[in-house]
A protein has these predicted regions:
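Conserved catalytic-core segment of nucleotide-activated headgroup transferases in glycan assembly
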Residues: 73-146
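Donor nucleotide-activated moiety binding/catalytic core segment of transferases
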Residues: 64, 141-183, 187-188
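A short, well-ordered alpha-helix in the C-terminal region of glycosyltransferases
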Residues: 241-254
């Protein structure tokens, strides 16, 4: 502001429990008042800001919807992943997973030989990869060590490199988004945009897109193994349910594009 350079906040979202709206949040409210304009995701954010005297606000939606649509349109062709999946296998893609997530879906995977699993853990250091491998009871291969021969002989593909997850979701029948048993879930839209059901843990409340996916019946939140098992059992045996859930997820992701 000393140099008279405009400052904007884009694709912001505000919640009632944030410090800006507390009686002791004056310093933080002053920071918001320094913005020339705030472009927010929803009407609720605009109302909260109005109550603290901030009126330079426009509701424009969430730019991430346009971004994930662009990512889908530019998705990489991954021949080894396609070969691993094969023609008929029910493939479960777990993205940005952490240990507590992995404990649940690996238990299910180990006891269900009819399915295949692609894991793209959030942390891909050697210690975490070894930890994942120690829990597996079925054949696996790391992506960086996969080839046209060994990828046909395994049931689990571990993505041990960055930059592929947003393209990999399209090879799954169902996606699991990690982080819901820790600080909060990761990006649900990257999976939903492919029109597949989305599953995540119980800590999703800070993410409006996750809440709306649940409301649209394009996603389901689970809190323990029994709930995950019941959901995956149904997805594998009720094709209509799986396709309708996926269609709901895809429609939600696409319906909010081009609003920014």
């Amino acid at each position: 502001h000393k140099r008279r350079i405009p400052v904007y906040s884009v694709s912001s979202i505000f919640r009632r429990d944030q410090i800006f709206f507390k009686w002791y949040g004056g310093t933080y409210r002053n920071v918001l008042k320094d913005f020339d304009h705030l472009f927010v995701q929803n009407e609720a954010s605009k109302r909260y800001l109005s109550k603290i005297g901030i009126s330079r606000v426009t509701v424009v939606g969430d730019t991430r919807f346009d971004r994930v649509l662009q990512i889908r349109e530019e998705a990489k062709d991954l021949p080894l992943v396609k070969m691993f999946k094969g023609d008929n296998a029910f493939t479960f893609v777990a993205g940005s997973s952490w240990g507590p997530d992995e404990d649940l879906f690996l238990e299910y995977f180990n006891s269900h030989p009819e399915m295949k699993l692609i894991i793209a853990p959030h942390v891909i250091d050697e210690n975490h990869l070894v930890e994942i491998i120690s829990k597996l009871k079925r054949p696996y291969v790391r992506y960086t060590r996969a080839d046209e021969k060994n990828v046909l002989k395994v049931d689990c593909l571990i993505i041990d490199c960055f930059g592929l997850l947003s393209s990999i979701y399209r090879y799954g029948e169902v996606a699991y988004i990690g982080g819901g048993f820790g600080v909060g879930i990761h990006n649900t839209l990257e999976a939903a945009v492919y029109g597949i059901p989305v599953i995540f843990g119980p800590k999703y409340q800070k993410f409006m897109e996750a809440i709306r996916l649940l409301e649209a019946k394009g996603a389901y939140s689970i809190k323990d193994y029994d709930e995950l098992k019941a959901l995956l059992d149904r997805f594998q045996t009720d094709d209509v349910f799986m396709r309708e859930t996926g269609a709901n997820a895809g429609y939600y992701a696409v319906s909010y594009t081009h609003l920014t």
